[in-house]
A protein has these predicted regions:
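Active-site cofactor/cluster-binding pocket
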Residues: 1-182
Length: 182
């Protein structure tokens, strides 16, 4: 099993945090091999950002793949820039609060979640990435959900009041992902 994932969006949407959390939690809690490769645009907050995460049973030959099983897009420019890198049969995860453009491919699975609006609705606007991570894990089963929940607890160990809200946000996304899994 090997999953090639790209997460792309604006700086400030938690793109890197989402990828790093997935990679670190998977590395710590499983026997899987993982790579995380960040790529920043010219500006941090508000500029473009993307990262690659590869999860595999076998040794990973390259940390970046331009032939993706999974693509998470948190904004419209990322959809247009990277949609052609998604393999037929791949999974496209869309932040449908912001990305409203139609997807002109019928050979992929599209999983939509209004994660920006959801994060605002729960009073935690910075949790959109954790919600989307839940959507991803719920739809793909790339790693067991408990792996990410442990990763959230580890990430926020110095700010324990943030653990429960982020685990709850992750679980909200998890349910959406499970409901839309193909």
């Amino acid at each position: 099993m090997e999953r090639n994932l790209m997460i792309a969006g604006f700086g400030g949407q938690g793109v890197m945090t989402m990828g790093k959390l997935l990679a670190e939690a998977t590395s710590e809690a499983t026997d899987l091999n993982v790579t995380f490769f960040p790529s920043y645009g010219a500006a941090m907050r508000g500029g473009t950002a993307n990262c690659y995460v590869v999860i595999s049973d076998d040794p990973i030959g390259a940390p970046v793949s331009y032939s993706l099983e999974d693509l998470v897009v948190m904004n419209g420019p990322s959809l247009h820039k990277f949609i052609d890198n998604l393999k037929p049969g791949g999974n496209l995860f869309v932040n449908s609060t912001i990305v409203t453009d139609p997807v002109d491919r019928d050979d992929i699975n599209i999983i939509e979640a209004p994660v920006t609006q959801m994060s605002i609705d729960i009073g935690n606007p910075r949790a959109l990435n954790v919600i989307m991570l839940g959507v991803y894990v719920g739809a793909t089963n790339a790693v067991p959900p408990e792996v990410i929940e442990k990763g959230i607890a580890h990430k926020f160990a110095k700010k324990p009041k943030l653990i429960d809200p982020n685990v709850e946000a992750f679980r909200m996304g998890l349910e959406i992902g499970k409901a839309q899994a193909k």
